Amino acid sequence: LYGCSAENETAAVSSRDYVSEDMRLRIEQLKQSVAGEPTSESTIAERAELLADWIDAYALAGGEVGVDAPGIRIQATLPPTGNAAVTQSRNVDRFVREFALRDEEGALGFLSSDELGPYVVGSMQSLSQTWRVGSRSVETGGGFWVARHFAANFGQFQTDDPAGPGFISIETTDDDAVFEREIYMASGPHGGFEARNAQPAIAFRLVAGELDRGSSVTITYGDQRQGGSGLQMPTFESVRMPLPLYVDLDGSGEWRSLPITPFVIIGGEATGVHAFGPSVVEPGETFELSVRAEDPYFNRASGEMPAFEVLINDEVVATTQAGNEAITVLELSLANTGPHWVSVRSVDGTINGIGNPILVEEYPQYRIYWGDTHGHSGYSEGIGTVDQFMRFARDDARLDYVTHSEHDVWLDAGEWEIIRRATAEYDEPGKFIPFLGWEWTRYTRFGGHHNVLFREIGDQTPVSSLQFPVLSSLYAELHERYDSADIVVIPHAHNPGDFRQSDPQLEPLIEVMSTHGSFQWFMKNYLSHGHEVGVIAASDDHLSRPGYSAPHTGSLAQRGGLGAVLAPVRSRDAIFDGMKAKRTYATTGDRLILKFDVNGTNMGQRAPYSESRVISGRVIGTGPIRSITLYKNDEVLWQEEYLLEDNPGSEQELLLSFNSDSTPYFSGDMPRGWRHWRGELQVNGAELITAIPQDFYNPTTQYFQQNGNVVSFGTHTRGDSSSIRLRLAEVGPDASISLNLEEATETGWAPPFYRQRATIAATSIELNLAEIVAGIMTRNLPQAEYPNDNVTIRRVINGGERDISFTITDTEQPDQGDYYYFKVEQANDAIAWSSPVWVGGYPSQ
C-alpha cells in the first residue's frame, strides 16, 4: 500500500493507475503550485476542488485518507475569506503535501502489531504498535502523536509513573535516536472533538538523531515491564478498537495519520440476559425469540454461558443449552390472543432479564417493525466497521430495519462504496432490511443535521453537505436526482433541524430522541409550524451498535432509541411506505406496543373534520406504566397517573424522579445540555430497606451506592426522568428524605451557542413524606432559565398495570387541523411517543 500500510498488506493504491492520465497531470501541477506559492484566498476554491477529487480517488482505490481529509471539499463550495481563508489555505497545502507522501510508496512507513486480541472489556492489558521506517526517514524534530479517540474509553494514558496504570512508553531500534515527551493540545475526533475543547495528548519528539530506513519505533500502551498494571480496556466491544497514531516526519508540526490497527475487544462474563421477539403475531404462528446473554455493559457476553429458562406469562416454555454461545434463537408459537410478557432467568436463578411484550392478534392490519435509522461506525468519527454495524443490528439487536447513516463531512468516496456494497450484501428480503443512507451534516444555522434514506439500494451517491451546504439546496438536489417517493429525510434534534422549513414530499418524520437526550420540544416546533410530520427515535450510536445501544460518555449519555413502523409485512417497500405515511412511533429503547386513533383514524393520518373527537389508545408496556399524557395541539388535554398509592402505611414504596427541560432557551439554538444530579439522599424517620436505580446504565457518568439509610448517587437528565425506587419500613409521621446535591455544570456535545452552559449551585432540600398529596409531590429545583426542573416523589403501589387502554372524547373548541398525540412513561423511566392524528384541515404541500 502506498503511503503507510499495515505490515502484511499488499499494494492497493498505485500512483500510476488509480487516477486518469489527465488527472495525474493536474495533481502534479497542484503539487508544484503549492510548493512554489502557498494557497491563498484567490486560489483556494480551485485547489480545494482538485484536492478533494484526488482524496476521493485515492480512497476509491483502497487507501486510507484519515478523518478530516474529506471535509476539504467545503472550501471549494464555500470559499472562505479573510482570516478563515488564511487558516483553510494552510489546511489545503498541508493535505497536498500529505497526499504527495501517500502517493509515494512507503513514505509514511509501515504500522503493525503482534497481538490484536481479543481483549475482554474493562481488563488490564499491555498493547503495542510498531512503526517501521519506509522510504522517508524521520528527521530531528519529528515525532509521534499518541492520540486517543474521543469515544474509546480506555483508561488514563500517562508517562510519569512506569509502575502505574496506563503507562505509555516509546522505544526504537535506532541507537542514536532520543525522544522526549511533549504535550500536544488535540482537537477533533482524536482529541477533544471541538477546537474550543482541545485536550492534552501525549507526543514524543525526536530531539537527537534520525530514524533511518530499516529502523522501527514501538509504542507500548499500558507497559507492564516496570511493574505497571497495564491499560484498562474500554467498556464496549469492537472489531476495530482504535488507538490512533500520527507521525511527523520532518518537525513541521504536520501530523500524518497512520492506518488504524484493528484491536479486538470482546464482552465480559454473562451477568444479564435479554430476549427479543416480534411485537405482533397471529395465533399459532411460529416465530423466532432470541435470547442474548450480556455483560454489565450490554455487550454480547463471552466465556461460559449458563442455561436459561424462557418464561411467557410466568410459565416456562423453553430452556437454552449451557455452553459458549451467547445468542440462542428459539422457535415458539402462542395460541391465545392478547398480550404476552416474556422473561428469562438462568437455571440457577442468578441472572434475570426480560423481553419485549408480544401481542397475539387474529388478522392484524399492521405489524410493528423495529429499527434504527441513525447510527455510525468508524467511517466518520465513530468506531467499528460497517460489517460489525450490520451484524449487530441483525443478530444482537434483532432489528427489522436499519440505516448506517455516516456523517458526510467525514465520508470519503471509498467509504461510501463500502457502505453501499455492505448494505446490499446484508439485505435479506422478508427478514432484515438495511436502508442505504447517510447523515447530511451542517450546523443548525445552515439547516441542522438530517438523515437521508433511500428506498432501494442502487448506485446512488450522497447529496453531500460539502457540496450542497444549506438545507434548501439539499431538498432541491434530492428532487433533481431522485423520485421523492423513494426518499425519506429525518431531521434530528441534536444539532437540530431548522423547523421553519420542511419539505412535505421528502420529510415525513422527525427524530424526537436519541442517546443525546429526549427532545419533545422538537416535535412541538415542527407541528406548531404546520408541518405534517410523524415521530421516530434512533440511537445515534457511534460504536457500531445500532438498536440496542448502551450509553458510555457524557454526551451520548442514555440508551439509544428505536423507531416503530406499522406495516402489513416485513418488506422493504412496506416499511418504507410506513415511514412515508407516518405510521410510526418513537421509544427510548423499550419495545412498547402502542395503538392510537381519533375517530377510527390511525396515527400519522388525517381524519375528516368532526366537532366531536373520540380518542382511543392502548399501551402494552415492558413494565408497569407510570403515566399517560394526551396532547391536543401540543397542550395537555388529559393525563393519568397509574402507580399512585394514596393509603400509606408503615411500609411504603417511593419513586423519586429527577426531571429537567431540554428545550433551547433561545429559538434556533442547540438544545440545553444534560443536567447532572449528584450527591446524597438520606432517609429520616424510617428504615430504607432497598434503593434501586431505574435507568442507571452509563458507566461514565452514573453511579449508585446504598449504605444503610444513605444513598450516594450520580445521574443526569435531558428532557426525561431519572428515578430511584425506595422501599421503606417503619415509616413514622415525621419521615422525610434529605437531598443534598452537589454543584454541577451542564454537559453535552454541540453546546448552545446563544446561551452558555450553566453551572448549577449546590443545594439541599427536605422532602417531608407527610406533604405528599394524592400520592405525588413535586419540588421545583430551578436553574435560572429553566424554572420547572424538579424532583418528584410518587408513593407507588408494588407492581402496576402493563396493559392500559383509554378513551377520551373531546368537543372543546374544535378547529380544522387540530392534532392529537400521546406520551407514555413507565416506572423504569422508558418513554414512548405516538405520531399525531390530525382532524380536518389540509396538509402542507
Segments from the language model and where they lie:
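Ser/Thr/Pro/Gly-rich, low-complexity intrinsically disordered stalk/linker tracts of secreted
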Residues: 14-272
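Extended, charged catalytic domains and RNA/DNA-binding interfaces, predominantly
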Residues: 282-845
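Bacterial signal peptide processing site
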Residues: 5-7
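Short, compositionally biased P/S/T/A/G/V-rich stretches that sit at domain boundaries
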Residues: 67, 71-118, 273-280, 575-609, ...
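Outer-membrane beta-barrel proteins
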Residues: 117-119, 209, 233, 279, ...
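Beta-strand/beta-sandwich contexts
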Residues: 134, 277-280, 297-298
